[in-house]
Amino acid sequence: MRTATIKRKTKETDIEVTVDLDGTGVANAATGIGFFDHMLDLLAKHSRIDITVKAVGDLHVDFHHTTEDVGIALGQAVKQALGNMAGITRYATVLMPMDETLTRVVIDVSGRPFLVFKADFPRDKIGEFDTELVREWFQAFAMNAGVTLHVETLYGENSHHIAESCFKGLARALRAAVAIDPKTAGEVPSTKGQLGG
């Protein structure tokens, strides 16, 4: 069973995240941030990873701490659920359209955390959600999941569509990269014999 639960509590947030990499895409996101919950629901649905997120944060300050800390906890949960990464496909490339928007997401589930994020949002906010927090979430997720992640919106005009294409692109890339490759016969997909360094 490739599952994990992470609990993270600070003075700013109290978060519990559970993932099942071999799930069916069931989502249960409750962060108190409507748009963010929508993105997490998309992530679960299109990755086919079951994701439960319960978060209580200092939303009276702003959405930054909750968004970033959910990224941290979700990344840690994915990393823990992957274990030694034996048998995974490891790499994936996705082009994700959303109406006028097209985003490219490339992932290497390598144990080597890195993020390249290139997306220009026409607006500062989507509803009450600061668009700069999209990058903050991806940074927190990539660093804590231990993945190399390149996210680039090639073009787009609507901020909601841009954010959605980024999350859906990650979802489909994760779905492919963490899938078990029957040709590897359970081997770690690296000439080093291990991933993570």
Swiss-Prot record:
UniProt family annotation: Belongs to the imidazoleglycerol-phosphate dehydratase family.
Listed Gene3D superfamilies: Imidazole glycerol phosphate dehydratase, domain 1
Organism field: Rhodopseudomonas palustris (strain ATCC BAA-98 / CGA009)
Biological processes, Gene Ontology terms: L-histidine biosynthetic process
CC per GO annotation: cytoplasm
Domain of life (superkingdom): Bacteria
Catalytic activity: D-erythro-1-(imidazol-4-yl)glycerol 3-phosphate = 3-(imidazol-4-yl)-2-oxopropyl phosphate + H2O
Disulphide bridges, residue numbers: none
NCBIfam families: PRK00951.1-5, PRK00951.2-1, PRK00951.2-4
Name this polypeptide is given: Imidazoleglycerol-phosphate dehydratase
Transmembrane segments: none
GO molecular function: imidazoleglycerol-phosphate dehydratase activity
Cross-referenced Pfam families: IGPD
Subcellular location(s) of the protein: Cytoplasm
Pathway: Amino-acid biosynthesis; L-histidine biosynthesis; L-histidine from 5-phospho-alpha-D-ribose 1-diphosphate: step 6/9
Keywords in alphabetical order: Amino-acid biosynthesis, Cytoplasm, Histidine biosynthesis, Lyase
Designated gene of the protein: hisB
